[in-house]
Amino acid sequence: MEMTHYEKTPLIRQVFNNGKTNSWFYVKHEILQPGGSFKSRGIGHLIRKNNEEALSEGSGKLAVFSSSGGNAGLAAATACRSMALNCSVVVPKTTKPRMVKKIQSAGAKVIIHGDHWGEADEYLRHELMAQESQHGSKTLYVHPFDNETIWEGHSTIVDEIIEQLKENDISLPRVKALVCSVGGGGLFSGIIKGLERNHLAEKIPVVAVETAGCDVLNKSLKKGSPVTLEKLTSVATSLGSPYIASFAFESFNKYGCKSVVLSDQDVLATCLRYADDYNFIVEPACGASLHLCYHPEILEDILEQKIYEDDIVIIIACGGSCMTYEDFVKASSTLNVS
């Protein structure tokens, strides 16, 4: 039986101990994807689409290359395993050994090179891929987020949500917001694409959540044009992109989306609390969106409206495998998180 590169994930109503008696929040659990995050959707779609094209052209199977030592690299590795493709992932020296092992366990060849992602990426594209091309193989470079085909894959999350709401007899006008974390804008762009396809982009506001130190979208919005961050300082390393995808920036302004920036302390506290409440370990990038479940006043403030008992808010729990519970405890101690 052929494996699929992503799974339909549950949309679960969760009641949070936030001082209010409500059942607003429906959480989409992308942590249950084969690669542990939403990235399985888009990156898997990119790889599958290009592999099908290569086979139809008679070029043989693809050789796939990724330069992410995080969730994108793991998504590429798991997608390639499902299609029996060779996958090479170049990671910088800063990559945690447990992530290297995870990517290797998914069947990818891992090369450690460079002091940061930029050096790993350059080595991958200019050295490794060039060598493979000389051998006559058709190669595919997998960017972590900035690719329209990747967004197309991520957009399936919206189709699923609409289907699942219908199954639960929940009408779309009850949905007052869709909340997602933003790094480089891949997930956000996919959500916008999905909302556009379903004629909902102007009806359901998207709340984009970032952490201070990785808040490239918020800083770009304040400047009025995309900026590049020279330094990334947040504990939410999976949100650590130096730039925001152009489509994400343009769509934010076009559809009147909302921006929230949280502190590392707030996000770490939420991750620990969520683990205690639900026995799910989510990394800070995911905890950023879940933070609004524990603090609905932030949501009401940014939406400039009261959210009532019959209203629904969709939270994308984007997943991620970059931190363990021990990592949270250590980081929380360093940042004096109570």
From Swiss-Prot:
Pfam family, one: PALP
Record carries keyword Cytoplasm: yes
Cofactors, names only: pyridoxal 5'-phosphate
Gene Ontology molecular-function annotations: L-serine ammonia-lyase activity; pyridoxal phosphate binding; threonine deaminase activity
Keywords: Cytoplasm, Gluconeogenesis, Lyase, Pyridoxal phosphate
InterPro entries for this protein: Ser/Thr_Dehydratase (IPR050147), Ser/Thr_deHydtase_PyrdxlP-BS (IPR000634), TrpB-like_PALP (IPR001926), TrpB-like_PALP_sf (IPR036052)
GO CC field: cytoplasm
Recorded catalytic activity of this chain's protein: L-serine = pyruvate + NH4(+)
Modified residues (N6-(pyridoxal phosphate)lysine): K39
Disulfide feature: none
EC number(s) from the headed UniProt entry: 4.3.1.17
Name the record gives this protein: L-serine dehydratase
Organism of derivation: Saccharomyces cerevisiae (strain AWRI1631) (Baker's yeast)
